[in-house]
Amino acid sequence: IGAGLAMASKIRKTDEVTVFTIGDGGTSHGEFYAGLNYASAFKAPLVGVIQNNQYAISTPTSVQTGAETFAQKAVAFGAPFVQVDGNDFLAVYVAVKEAIDRARKGEGPSLVEAYTYRMGPHTTSDDPSIYRTKEEEQSWDHKDPILRFKAYLINKGFWSEEEDKALIEAVNKEINETFRKVESYGANVDLIEIFEHTYQEMTPQLKEQYETHKAFLKGSE
């Protein structure tokens, strides 16, 4: 889709640049390579950003690719690439901006790999302790991009601990007030609406899910 949108911009002669993001696991899909090859061959204004958080659900990068980096996969398409610290806000900004500027000048696609780490589970059904250690997770604690950028802004005099505290309090207040407001509306939607809005007629699987969930809610009353 990204390559197609970028090509449409080129055909229409606009200055639009398409930026797509993909996980490290997503690069194992064939359309990733097909799209980049197409964009490179026709110099489409496309920028790919790979979020390499080192795990595709539970699959480590070591068994996803034989390449040293994901960024270097761009070599096969004759496109420039760069790997940056994905937890460094400014590094990511500069790398993506340079890629966008290059695409806007008609020089074709670029690939940016943001090397980072997924701190939590992939989903609520995922248990990271099965495939990685607590020590590994803790080694990334101090690399939190929000805390790092906050420290940078404070050191440069653009921000302060007082402003940060006030901002957090204001945001938490807004979240709590919004939650209470929504909660006050009550359950005004029938349960079945969650399952019947996608298809004209519910599929057998959706009907089964609906009945299962209805029974679960009834049992928890």
Where are these regions (language model features)?
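Glycine-rich ThDP/TPP pyrophosphate-binding loop and its adjacent helix/strand module
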Residues: 1-184
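Intrinsic disorder at enzyme termini
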Residues: 191-221
